[in-house]
Amino acid sequence: MLFRSGELEECLKKAQAQRFRIIVTDGVFSMDGNAAPLDRICALAEKYDALVMVDECHSAGVLGETGRGITELYDLRGQVDILTGTLGKAFGGAVGGFTTGRREIIDMLRQRSRPYLFSNSLPPAVVGAGIETFKMLAESHELHDRLVANVEHFRAGMMAAGFDIKPTQSAICAVMLYDAKLSQEFAAKLQDEGVFVTGFYYPVVPKGQARIRVQVSAGDRKSVV
């Protein structure tokens, strides 16, 4: 069942008659850039005997002191049953993704997951590049530290210029424009200047909450940001 923020415990109570329960959440919500309250989610999972699955697409490589994701941010490593992620964002912009978890869960997915069974294998070059990216992030915090500094610099500059920008715990910065047409015009003019951003408006976001979404990169020099 789907749940809104603050309704999870009620949903878990209703699901007590079920044999299995699993809570599925994003690590970082892609429209606002805010992190899921994973500490509270894991506490409820333990209370109501539920598994926890987190999509780390926007949080792996970004959140936490060393970029190891939302479980590092909340000091919950080993307490999430299934983690999914992508190689298409923080880990180099390639194709493909990954799922991690206990061996019995992964073994079952290899046999029963239709998307996995009917997908082609990743090209060896992509796998090799992904492995090297993980090694780079494990050996040095330089890129992660640069990302954090760039996000702080971007937010400070935008707010100083008078823009309304949502709080964020990630590299996603939502610049609020509130008008759907304005968000599209704003995005188009920025692309004319060589800056790629995306304008979002209803129904992707609530009515009156149109915005452009900026994803800050560690690859940008501070002067460019």
Regions found by a protein language model. Name each.
Residues 48-51, 58, 63-169, 182:
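Active-site C-terminal subdomain of aminotransferase-like
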Residues 145-154, 159-194, 204, 208-212, ...:
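Conserved PLP-binding catalytic core of the aspartate aminotransferase-like
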Residues 8-17:
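Short amphipathic alpha-helix with an adjacent loop that forms part of the alpha/beta core around
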Residues 18, 22-23, 33-66:
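Catalytic PLP-binding core of fold-type I/II PLP enzymes
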Residues 5-7, 27-32, 59-63, 116-117, ...:
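Short, small-residue-enriched loops and turns at beta-alpha junctions
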Residues 21-26, 166-169:
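Short beta-strands and strand-loop turn motifs
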Residues 1-2:
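Short, small-residue-biased leader/transition segments that mark boundaries at the very start
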